[in-house]
Structure formats: C-alpha cells, structure tokens
C-alpha cells in the first residue's frame, strides 16, 4: 500500500492519530530546512489546520515547503485534514486549500485527535482509495 505522509507539530495530535491507523506513514519534519522528505511514490497527505479559523496561516509552513517541491506535489493523490469544529466553516480548512490548489480529492476531515470511528473510516477509506487507483 502507498504511504501516508503527514505533518504534526510538537503537540503530536496528528502523529497520535496516524499511529492509530497502523498504516505505512512518513512524517514531514518539523524543522523542514534541516531534513527534507522527498517522495518517490504516490501518497495521501494528512495535515492539521492552523490559523484559528482563518484561511490565512491555515496550512503549516512545513507542508507548504514540502508541497512546493515539484516532485512531492506530483505524487500527491489526496488529502485528509484535522481541524477544530469550533472554527465553524474553517474546520479542516487546510485540506480544502491543498485539495483546491493541488487539484486532488479532499478525502476526509476529523477533529483534533480523531475518534475511534474516524480511525476506522480513514483506514477503510485509504485502503479503498488505493484499490481504486491500482
């Protein structure tokens, strides 16, 4: 199965969610300038949403840098976003922004650490997505 690629800040919320998935995953480094992740296969991106409900600053800078690499952008096949429902329409907005800009499907959104149901939905959805791609 193709990997997930994710970013998680020092809060580790997204990291903990990805660990629960028990799927192959690679992490975008927090200190992006010191170590670079370069993808060589198609992947699905899992990204937290920042910015407190605003589109400005919603996509973490490390993710922007990662996707600014043409090779990484070329292998992106879909996006999943974490967010906070307190932000209303901006809940998981980083996923909306990336999906639109990179022209890939926005596959799922979950709140903060995600629920047991979110984990099951993402695991099943990712598996089905890759089966349809192959």
UniProtKB/Swiss-Prot annotation:
Pfam families: Flavodoxin_NdrI
Any one GO molecular-function label of the UniProt entry: FMN binding
GO biological process terms held by the UniProt record: protein modification process
Classification via Gene3D superfamilies: 3.40.50.360
Purpose: Probably involved in ribonucleotide reductase function.
PANTHER family, per the entry: PROTEIN NRDI
HAMAP family (alphabetical): NrdI (MF_00128)
Alphabetical list of NCBIfam families matching this protein: nrdI
Family from the record: Belongs to the NrdI family.
Protein name (record): Protein NrdI
Organism taxonomic ancestry: Bacteria, Pseudomonadati, Pseudomonadota, Gammaproteobacteria, Enterobacterales
Gene name linked to the record: nrdI
């Amino acid at each position: 199965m193709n990997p997930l690629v994710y970013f998680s800040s020092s809060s580790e919320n997204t990291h903990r969610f990805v660990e629960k998935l028990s799927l192959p995953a690679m992490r975008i480094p927090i200190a992006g300038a010191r170590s670079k992740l370069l993808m060589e296969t198609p992947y699905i991106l899992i990204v937290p949403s920042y910015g407190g409900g605003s589109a400005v600053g919603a996509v973490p800078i490390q993710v922007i840098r990662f996707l600014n690499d043409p090779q990484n952008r070329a292998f992106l096949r879909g996006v999943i976003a974490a967010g906070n429902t307190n932000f209303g329409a901006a809940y998981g907005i980083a996923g909306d922004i990336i999906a639109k800009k990179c022209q890939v499907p926005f596959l799922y959104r979950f709140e903060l650490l995600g629920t047991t149901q979110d984990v099951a939905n993402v695991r099943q959805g990712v598996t089905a997505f890759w089966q349809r791609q192959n």
